């Protein structure tokens, strides 16, 4: 990769959440293997991000590569309208078998945000088919559900990266963010705000949509499982649908295959993505119950009104099948448990740093919340110099490594975080 390539990149290519007039530096990756990203100058960085929660098996995994190479020789893509194929059938069979009952109807889509859009459309069309004008969603403050318009409408309008769009989006209902922590005691008072909104708007609400146990990009907050039990009970009592957005938490990240399992509940609609293909291809899935699917199908339209061009892409489905086969081997449970123990031990010293507000760990997620926002460019440069890839944002320095990470690799990540929080120059004050 030449200097001209990098200059073109900075001049013409938009990166996620980056300015075109003052772009953040980018680091040229030429290959990746295991838990390492290899830069064009030969430096190897231990990946602490799993490419945003996705590459749970690491990079260049032989099983994933073999599945995709085999599939591409047969067909890389074919439309899903009026056509089906073995990779999609196998994938949906696996998903129905592994997700909480009674989820049994699967809609395949392109990305996590689209999976959320699909879930919201399902909820709205469900109530339309029942002849009820329910058009609002109830969710938490500090939540994040994606970057498309519907998904943005259920992200916190005041405390998220989408606050710019407040006033342009449908006005949904936002309960106070959960305060009862995953590692703490349940506080009954936590439910008051949620219960009040439900009581006041029960006849308007199409669905409750939440990120189970872990609020992701909205703050990396980990809350008590009792919340899920209470919400499930309230939704059942009121006849309101429950959507679980497990785009980030699904497939083992929290120590359970799905975060809903921490409370032993099942949603009416479940959104999956990110790790679905082991981080190799873009693919998502939205699952729902037979009752929801048949109600929609028996409505005025006679079908669910959605159909992406690349729905059920065979190449992505083949990758997903291989990824799920790796998970089915069972090794991930011990891997995630070992990562959790190491993260708890090795991030504990960060609690004593003046710039640190909180440290929290669950499964293969380690979060250091700081008292001041990070200086992204300076801190990113420091991490690269330390031989690690960590992408902080706001007041969060967090780790979500591939499950296959070696103890010595994880130690490099935690050591870099501990060194970073001791240096006040990495923070905006």
UniProtKB/Swiss-Prot annotation:
Stored Gene3D superfamilies: Aspartate Aminotransferase, domain 1, Type I PLP-dependent aspartate aminotransferase-like (Major domain)
Entry-annotated residues carrying N6-(pyridoxal phosphate)lysine: 274
Coarse class of the primary localization is cytoplasm
Q: Which reaction does it catalyse?
A: (8S)-8-amino-7-oxononanoate + S-adenosyl-L-methionine = S-adenosyl-4-methylsulfanyl-2-oxobutanoate + (7R,8S)-7,8-diammoniononanoate
Effect in UniProt of substituting residue 253 to Q:
Increases aminotransferase activity toward SAM
Q: What class of enzyme is it?
A: transferase
Assembly: Homodimer.
Family to which the UniProt record says this protein belongs: Belongs to the class-III pyridoxal-phosphate-dependent aminotransferase family. BioA subfamily.
Q: What is this protein called?
A: Adenosylmethionine-8-amino-7-oxononanoate aminotransferase
